Amino acid sequence: MMSTDGNVFDLSGMRGKSVLLYFQEGVTCQPCWDQAKDLATHSDQLRALGVDSVVTIASDPVDVMRRVAKDMSLSYPVLSDPDLAVSSAYHANDYGMMGRSRDGHSFVLVGPDGRIRWRADYGGAPDYTMYLPVPNLIADMRQGMRIPG
């Protein structure tokens, strides 16, 4: 996938690291971008949980997302998945207000071995949650991965 930094991102290049994939609706969803910023703000807590990197994925064109990522000073990869190929592979567009035309609000933690260690989908009915405080996300991750907290 194309990154807002102009490079092509390939998850296989992150082998040996835990990567939190954050699938979101994109530039028209301000709470989604607030979530992206909050993930960056809480990077130390995520690292303490074993998350080496965060990646944000949406279906908007990379040039549009580049402006938003720059405005928000996001330092981690922001990726464009315009045909929803990666999103569909992770079923991230199965949940959310827009049906399958856009991602919902899904998180997938890919472990160092490339396997999914944890996932959660917050964008679906009945609540359509577009922002989850990161401490709540961390608590959900701890519970889902059975890490004492």
Task: Give residue spans per PLM region.
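N-terminal "domain-start" segment that seeds a small globular fold
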Residues: M1-S12
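Short active-site neighborhood of thiol/selenol oxidoreductases, capturing the structured segment around
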Residues: L11-L39, S53
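Short hydrophobic alpha-helix segments
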Residues: S12, Y90, R119-A120
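Structural microenvironment flanking redox-active thiols in thiol-disulfide oxidoreductases
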Residues: W33-S75
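Short, internal strand/loop/helix patches
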Residues: R66-G104
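Thiol-/selenol-based redox modules, centered on thioredoxin-like
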Residues: S101-G149
